[in-house]
Amino acid sequence: MANATIQQRLVAVRSFYEYLVEDGLREQNPVRRGQAGRGGRRPRQGLVQHIEQAPWIPNEVVWQRILAACGAESLRNRLMVTLAYDGALRRQELVQLDVEDFEPAHCLIHLRAETTKSQRAREVAFGTTSSQLFVAYLRERRTLFGRIDGPLFRSMSNRNCGAPLGASSWSKTVEGIARRAGAARLSTHTFRHLRLTDLARADWTIDQIAQYAGHRDLATTMRYIHLSGRELAARFHRANTTIHADRERLLASLLEDR
């Protein structure tokens, strides 16, 4: 069982024992909480050690398989994939997009505060492929539903055809892509992780990436960036070469007689 699942279940068990203690049915709660260290004291571990695993992002080979699997999807779903990546969008942010949120002339999406996790509006960009899919999907959407404004993504199910698409439908779509691509760890959040990592590869600063992601805390942004060991080593050598050149330039002044 995943560590996160165990932690969630412990919360329920701990709450139950707290109820028993409050009602006088038990003297103490056996499911202890972890505590951060304060005043020089060592932190106290909870009943089960909290293990935070690095989120997964695909390498280039797996990413190619994912894109190949996406090729079999509908126009709507292909647009959702490209926007999820381009804008580093969370699941709820993606499914709650309105047509009016788009500024095609500048390839911008205006994310409304009420649709974001942080409750703060922000702007993200989209690329040429997303732009072309967006125009094609609007054309298809108008033919199918006879409308342009309102929620962008509409259900094509016989049960609720034309209704705004729900988050669970998008999750099921990604699960299907994952099966066909042989990428079991692919999730709706993977596109966000990959995009933010690619921005780091493009030498965006951590502050710029945090703004794009809609993070209040830079520590949160750091958890989203997954540069490989080779990439980090290459950056180190580039930086070291620059520093060494500067040092040599300064040392060269010693060659001059004074």
PLM region spans:
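Short, basic (Lys/Arg/His-rich) helix/loop patches that form interaction surfaces
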Residues: 171-211
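Active-site/catalytic core of tyrosine-dependent DNA strand-transfer enzymes
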Residues: 127-183
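Flexible interdomain linker/hinge and immediately adjacent N-terminus
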Residues: 25-65, 155-163
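Conserved tyrosine-mediated DNA breakage-rejoining catalytic core shared by Y-recombinases
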Residues: 36, 92, 96-139
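Basic, Lys/Arg- and aromatic-enriched nucleic-acid-binding interface segment
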Residues: 58-91
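C-terminal secondary-structure termini that scaffold catalytic or DNA-interacting sites
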Residues: 238-258
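N-terminal core-binding DNA-recognition domain of tyrosine recombinases/integrases
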Residues: 1-48, 142
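Catalytic-site neighborhood detector that most strongly recognizes the C-terminal catalytic loop/helix
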Residues: 115, 213-238
